[in-house]
């Protein structure tokens, strides 16, 4: 009888400044969108867990909010959420952009990584956007910052070197159980992912002052008939002046947000969806603990 192959499992944190491609890498690894992507800072607000499973390995990736200097209770929640993962994982991926020089934000994170005992990998993203000589300059800027386990230049968007990174991480994980079923790619409920897909479209389509003031609450999900799933959601904003931006002339912007979000939600659920969106003004919600909790930002969950 052939000896059964040992199963390896563990947890990997993805950490870095806002907009370095953490969510793009997570989605690439699991093969489906579980974390929203945008060129706006602070896109990810919760720790998103993506699950990568093969015949002999299960890696649970935690995509943290981008670390930045907080300016509100929500910002404080995001940074605490990111830093709280570091002592609980088997490996840490510190992601940077190949097309950006090392700055104060990177040094802020590096200082906090100095106390981490787990192996830390420097992952240099967006190598498809720079000349190889520039990549060497970036590597030189970081080479002595921390005792890196390894340095991996990748393109999360194109997939360059991502498989090689996964192979290396597999060797880092201890023998352990399979925590989740093989076909499960995230531990977040569908409601959360649907709300994030809607928020992603708000981030993509609205002007700079709106995205940071936006939350999305799923009011109901139910099968309306044999053909469609009926989703009702409310887009929360902070100021009345933002309501007109979200709705648009004659409702054009809200319709566009709904149309693009519905497409992604249908892909997620594998079914036809009727999406009904509302817009509500809730002043200063980012600094109100009761509202943060009701919108899904609970510090005690982290």
Curated annotation (Swiss-Prot):
Instruction: Note down the stretches annotated as region G1.
Output: 16-23
* MF annotations from Gene Ontology: GTP binding; GTPase activity; ribosomal small subunit binding; small ribosomal subunit rRNA binding
Ranges for the region named G4 are 125-128
Q: Which residues form the Era-type G domain?
A: 8-175
User: Which residues make up the binding site for GTP?
Assistant: 16-23, 63-67, 125-128
Organism's domain of life? Bacteria
Give the main location. Answer: cytoplasm
Keywords recorded for this protein, A-Z:
Cell membrane, Cytoplasm, GTP-binding, Membrane, Nucleotide-binding, Ribosome biogenesis, RNA-binding, rRNA-binding
An annotated GO cellular component of this protein is: cytosol
Q: Where in the cell is it found?
A: Cytoplasm; Cell membrane
Q: Where is this region: G2?
A: 42-46
Q: Where is this region: G3?
A: 63-66
Topological type in the membrane: Peripheral membrane protein
Q: Where is this region: G5?
A: 154-156
Q: What does this protein do?
A: An essential GTPase that binds both GDP and GTP, with rapid nucleotide exchange. Plays a role in 16S rRNA processing and 30S ribosomal subunit biogenesis and possibly also in cell cycle regulation and energy metabolism.
- Family classification: Belongs to the TRAFAC class TrmE-Era-EngA-EngB-Septin-like GTPase superfamily. Era GTPase family.
HAMAP family per the UniProt record, alphabetical: GTPase_Era
Q: What is this protein called?
A: GTPase Era
Gene name for this UniProt entry? era
């Amino acid at each position: 009888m052939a000896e059964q192959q040992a199963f390896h499992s563990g947890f990997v944190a993805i950490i870095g400044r806002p907009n370095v491609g953490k969510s793009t890498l997570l989605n690439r690894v699991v093969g489906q969108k579980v974390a929203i992507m945008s060129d706006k800072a602070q896109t990810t607000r919760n720790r998103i867990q993506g699950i990568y499973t093969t015949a002999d390995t299960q890696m649970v990736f935690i995509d943290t909010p981008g670390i930045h200097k907080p300016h509100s209770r929500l910002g404080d929640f995001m940074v605490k959420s990111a830093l709280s993962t570091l002592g609980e994982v088997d490996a840490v991926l510190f992601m940077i952009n190949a097309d950006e020089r090392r700055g104060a934000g990177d040094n802020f994170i590096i200082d906090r990584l100095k106390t981490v005992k787990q192996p830390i990998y420097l992952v240099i993203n967006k190598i498809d956007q720079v000349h190889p000589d520039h990549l060497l300059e970036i590597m030189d800027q970081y080479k002595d910052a921390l005792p890196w386990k390894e340095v991996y230049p990748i393109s999360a968007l194109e997939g360059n070197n991502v498989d090689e990174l996964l192979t290396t991480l597999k060797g880092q994980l201890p023998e352990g159980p399979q925590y989740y079923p093989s076909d499960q790619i995230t531990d977040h409920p569908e409601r959360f992912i649907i709300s994030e897909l809607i928020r992603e479209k708000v981030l993509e389509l609205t002007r700079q002052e709106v995205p940071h003031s936006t939350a999305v609450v799923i009011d109901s999900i139910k099968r309306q008939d044999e053909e469609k799933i009926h989703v009702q959601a409310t887009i929360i904003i902070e100021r009345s002046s933002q309501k007109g931006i979200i709705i648009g002339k004659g409702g054009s912007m809200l319709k566009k947000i709904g149309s693009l979000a519905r497409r992604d939600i249908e892909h997620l659920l594998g079914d036809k969806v009727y999406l009904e969106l509302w817009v509500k003004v809730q002043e200063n919600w980012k600094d109100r603990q009761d509202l943060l909790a009701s919108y899904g930002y609970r510090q005690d969950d982290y």
